[in-house]
Curated annotation (Swiss-Prot):
It is found in: Cytoplasm. Keywords: Acyltransferase, Cell shape, Cell wall biogenesis/degradation, Cytoplasm, Peptidoglycan synthesis, Transferase. SUPFAM superfamilies: Acyl-CoA N-acyltransferases (Nat). It comes from Staphylococcus epidermidis (strain ATCC 12228 / FDA PCI 1200). Belongs to the FemABX family. The keyword Transport does not apply. PROSITE patterns: FEMABX (PS51191). Its EC number is 2.3.2.18. This is Aminoacyltransferase FemB. It catalyses: MurNAc-L-Ala-D-isoglutaminyl-L-Lys-(N(6)-tri-Gly)-D-Ala-D-Ala-diphospho-di-trans,octa-cis-undecaprenyl-GlcNAc + 2 glycyl-tRNA(Gly) = MurNAc-L-Ala-D-isoglutaminyl-L-Lys-(N(6)-penta-Gly)-D-Ala-D-Ala-diphospho-di-trans,octa-cis-undecaprenyl-GlcNAc + 2 tRNA(Gly) + 2 H(+). GO terms for biological process: cell wall organization; peptidoglycan biosynthetic process; regulation of cell shape.
Amino acid sequence: MKFTELTVKEFENFVQNPSLESHYFQVKENIAIRESDGFQVVLLGVKDDDNRVIAASLFSKIPTMGSYVYYSNRGPVMDYSDLGLVDFYLKELDKYLHQHQCLYVKLDPYWLYQVYDKDINPLTEKNDALVNLFKSHGYDHHGFTTQYDSSSQVRWMGVLDLEGKTPASLRKEFDSQRKRNINKAINYGVKVRFLSKDEFDLFLDLYRETEARTGFASKTDDYFYNFIEHYGDKVLVPLAYIDLNEYIQHLQESLNDKENRRDDMMAKENKTDKQLKKIAELDKQIDHDKKELLQASELRQTDGEILNLASGVYFANAYEVNYFSGGSSEKYNQYMGPYAMHWHMINYCFDNGYDRYNFYGLSGDFTENSEDYGVYRFKRGFNVRIEELIGDFYKPINKVKYWLFNTLDRIRNKLKK
């Protein structure tokens, strides 16, 4: 085996293998994004004796104190079950970094530490062997965190395993609320379409509304546009919406049908108890439809014919479709826009051969007092599998300068208080 810099083509060909479980940050499109942020990029990998790439990683070189912080965001990409390969990569990476002005290196591999069911019952053993291997190479583990951290990627995820399933069989695994709300969205006639680059402000409007409502930390407009600009068809932006003209027409047709059936039954003499109960039930349905019709007509008059309900940003790579971020309208929540969007994207996975639908981030704190308990409950209702990643690893390369860097950082933090 040999450790070497890779070409973009070598890197891209390697990470296209879905068995490597790579992340959307470890794709060639991210090179341009990192460079637009002002960072140099280097692709570092391992080739076997037949010159085939067996490990690869996109590193950002972040200028710091006359040196560089080397950061592999969700890398390196390799088969981490091959501990011999991991050992070789880390050993050779250390040699490379000592020769290339590295202050310290940060790795946060997209690899599992443990898997749980939706109720946090363990399904696999802990991957301590991998964590200990990193530590044996002098890496500090950031810990098994159970909260969001702005300096780290999420360490917990909710994932749907689609392999061997169909939309119908998968839906049977959802809880009653998920099934009911998906059905509501379908009955309302909610539609989903993908936004073009020129329409991305429709996503941002819903995202900013959700940000203001929930208080969650958010990304800048430029952050999103950077992905839209560079990721091409690897970024998907669905919009769930309702066309009130179509919905009102459907309601009116349904109302007319029920009124006609009620009138036909009322015209009959000597009605049975069963018929009287049916008439009473139709009267309830007619009253409900009239209220819905009035509300929809008023909304059309005040808010327009098209109501934008929910939107999201997704990344698709060789491994999975990943829900990155989203927003929804609280005013129109009765139409179940988020459910329509997720159900549409789950079906997109089936239609395009993906075996994983990743709802993505969770804090790892699954108690009722956690900051994202509502998010967990939402994802839990889809019968997700909870995946815990192994976390962040740091290693100082220039130890003297690294000590000085940390000392100055502590002083700056004290002065801010």
